[in-house]
């Protein structure tokens, strides 16, 4: 087991948060989300597995929640489980079943792109080096199943905290997370790599020198642009939606800054999600005039859009910005599929469908394969049953009605969820 310079600081903060209660642990977990490359512990004996700060903070919340649950049960008190938690629990159970039984049932019956580190396999294309291996149990089945179970338990614990503290507390957690994400993005944009090295401890490939058409990609506290772009688009979506409903300057600042950083991450998936969410918000502005959209937000949007249109017009007419923009869009969007990276990801996606076919719709096991795109990962790993459970969870978590006081926050959460799903 390896510790890092940041490890004692983290464990000290975790101990203090544990003493203060579950709400502080939830706030700390949210604060750790932007530190996507900050490992607190590394396990060389398990293939160099990095335990991230966010995961350990979530585990702390789950542990405290488990103690409270056990106390209630020992006292004979009833425990209510939300339908969304039940659906996610069924997904987690099937994930465990697939990672322990199905991966052995179909071992040697199909070839997959492995998640395991350092496994090259048999090359299937001259365009990329990643190859296929015969399906079989690996350490990634254990690690990925652990993350699924942790996510389920975290959702249950976080739900209980929000029921006690109110949905507004969840928004406060997101404010903290978004602010930290912007600070880390600013440090990365300023080239403060020596300072960021303290939190870049995970055993991941660091892509902090990547650029597109000479423009460096911003990755913040994450290992690469796609992760940073996806997370930052989430914050843009939530606070953009929040600003339309509240007109608060705070929401506008966070949304605008997050949108800018998501744009300069130059991540294909992040940009697609950013455009998609922007269109959703614009449609809400048009449809909600005089209704659900705050008047202050409408005035601000009108001023901002006019200023942006003038600025873009000036840049396109009097500078070479148009050529640079077209080159970036062409590389990230239109020629992406024909690049080696695009070919690789297309092969990963097809690999997920092949695993679904070869497992007769059951899936080859959580952590058994590398695929691309949420739906392909789900279908290949946990099959039709697991995918159905996950979709049921999404519907139950975001498709229902909230109390009048929390309706606006639910709308914001739905917008953020759309951003995450598109970015995946």
Features from the language model and the residues they span:
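Transmembrane signal-anchor hairpin modules in multi-pass inner-membrane enzymes, especially those
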Residues: 1-122, 298, 407
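Alpha-helical transmembrane segments of multi-pass inner-membrane proteins
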Residues: 8-18, 145-157, 171-200, 210-215, ...
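A membrane-periplasm/extracellular boundary helix in multi-pass inner-membrane enzymes
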Residues: 46, 93, 188-196, 281-336
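Membrane-interfacial helix-loop-helix modules of multi-pass inner-membrane proteins that assemble, modify
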Residues: 102-134, 166-168, 179-222, 326, ...
């Amino acid at each position: 087991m390896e510790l890092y310079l940041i490890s004692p600081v983290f464990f000290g903060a975790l101990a203090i948060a544990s003493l203060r209660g579950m709400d502080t642990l939830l706030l700390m977990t949210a604060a750790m989300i932007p530190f996507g490359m900050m490992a607190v512990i590394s396990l060389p004996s398990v293939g160099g597995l990095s335990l991230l700060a966010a995961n350990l903070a979530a585990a702390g919340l789950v542990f405290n929640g488990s103690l409270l649950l056990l106390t209630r049960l020992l006292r004979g008190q009833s425990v209510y489980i939300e339908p969304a938690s039940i659906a996610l629990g069924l997904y987690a159970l099937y994930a465990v079943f697939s990672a322990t039984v199905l991966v052995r049932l179909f071992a040697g019956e199909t070839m997959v792109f492995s998640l395991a580190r350092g496994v090259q396999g048999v090359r299937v294309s001259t365009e990329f080096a990643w190859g296929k291996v015969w399906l079989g149990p690996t350490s990634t089945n254990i690690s990925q199943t652990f993350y699924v179970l942790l996510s389920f338990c975290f959702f249950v614990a976080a739900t209980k905290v929000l029921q006690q503290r109110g949905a507004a507390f969840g928004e406060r957690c997101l404010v903290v997370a978004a602010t930290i994400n912007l600070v880390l993005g600013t440090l990365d944009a300023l080239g403060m790599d020596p300072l960021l090295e303290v939190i870049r401890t995970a055993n991941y490939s660091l892509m902090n020198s990547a650029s597109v058409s000479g423009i460096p990609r911003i990755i913040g506290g994450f290992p690469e642009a796609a992760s940073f772009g996806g997370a930052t688009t989430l914050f843009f979506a939530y606070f953009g939606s929040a600003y339309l409903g509240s007109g608060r300057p705070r929401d506008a600042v966070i949304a605008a800054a997050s949108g800018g950083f998501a744009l300069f991450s130059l991540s294909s998936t992040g940009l697609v999600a950013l455009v998609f969410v922007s269109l959703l918000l614009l449609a809400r502005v048009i449809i909600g005039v005089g209704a659900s959209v705050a008047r202050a937000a409408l005035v601000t949007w009108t001023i901002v859009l006019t200023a942006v249109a003038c600025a873009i017009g000036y840049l396109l007419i009097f500078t070479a910005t148009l050529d640079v923009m077209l080159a970036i869009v062409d590389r990230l969007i239109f020629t992406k599929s024909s690049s080696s990276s695009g070919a690789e990801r297309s092969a990963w996606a097809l690999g997920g469908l092949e695993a679904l076919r070869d497992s007769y719709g059951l899936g080859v096991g959580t952590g058994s394969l590398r695929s691309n795109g949420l739906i392909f990962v789900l279908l290949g790993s946990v099959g039709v049953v697991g995918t159905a459970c996950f979709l049921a969870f999404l519907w139950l978590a975001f498709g229902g009605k909230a109390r009048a006081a929390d309706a606006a926050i639910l709308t914001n959460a739905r917008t953020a969820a759309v951003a995450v799903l598109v970015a995946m």
